[in-house]
């Protein structure tokens, strides 16, 4: 397994009240597979995803990626690994409003520290935009895009640096059923063809057919 968590716990304290959100979660992700996390609101599924992605720190437990304990690394080294090897897609596309589709992806390559030349970066961006069906919109700004188009660009941005892990938190929440299926078909195709390990949180049961594994969170644990 390329990615795993071991006994992840997370508590939040408000005043004198402490609430344990995650109660010792063991999770594994495999390349070329979509793992879907489901559960009721407040079950801890989004908290688990953000901790796995390094966007939150656990109260205790270990996160292993590609044979390394991320918690044992320096913060700088852990950030570098996340920038190079992790991709993120969220409910909202979070596109930069004043950048074109092409520029969104070029910025991602720069952020990830891509070793490619400027020419190679543009070629890679063009290839990925074509892959997600948005090559004809490379000069478009977010304001002129539909919700489905924005999410396709967000997915392209998340994979342009060839990450090994993709974290997707409710990636279809803002889309209608038709666009949701299109986005899931795209995620499924990219997960397989690029051999990415994808972890997805969703509340839409009809989309679970696109997942290779479905895990249920209940009361801070994997049921």
What are the functions of these language-model segments?
Residues 223:
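C-terminal segments of enzyme domains that contribute to small-molecule binding surfaces
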Residues 2-3, 8-25, 29-210, 214-217:
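ABC family nucleotide-binding domain
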């Amino acid at each position: 397994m390329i990615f795993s968590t071991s006994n992840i716990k997370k508590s939040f304290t408000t005043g004198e009240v402490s609430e344990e959100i995650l109660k010792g979660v063991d999770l594994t992700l495999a390349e070329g597979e979509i793992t879907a996390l489901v559960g009721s609101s407040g079950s801890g599924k989004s908290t688990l995803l953000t901790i796995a992605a390094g966007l939150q720190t656990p109260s205790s437990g270990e996160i292993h990626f590609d044979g390394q304990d991320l918690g044992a690394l320096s913060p700088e080294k852990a950030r570098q690994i996340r920038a190079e090897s992790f991709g993120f897609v969220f409910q909202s596309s979070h596109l930069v409003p004043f950048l074109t589709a092409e520029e969104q992806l070029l910025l991602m390559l720069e952020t990830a520290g891509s070793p490619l030349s400027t020419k190679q970066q543009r070629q890679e961006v063009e290839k990925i935009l074509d892959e997600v069906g948005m090559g004809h919109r490379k000069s478009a700004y977010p304001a002129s895009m539909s919700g489905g188009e924005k999410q396709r660009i967000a997915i392209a941005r998340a994979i342009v640096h060839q990450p090994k892990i993709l974290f997707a938190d409710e990636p279809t929440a803002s889309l209608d059923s038709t666009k949701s299926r299109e986005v899931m078909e795209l995620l499924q195709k990219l997960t397989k063809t690029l051999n990415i390990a994808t972890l997805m949180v969703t509340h839409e049961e009809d989309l679970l057919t696109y997942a290779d594994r479905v895990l249920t969170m209940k009361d801070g644990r994997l049921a």
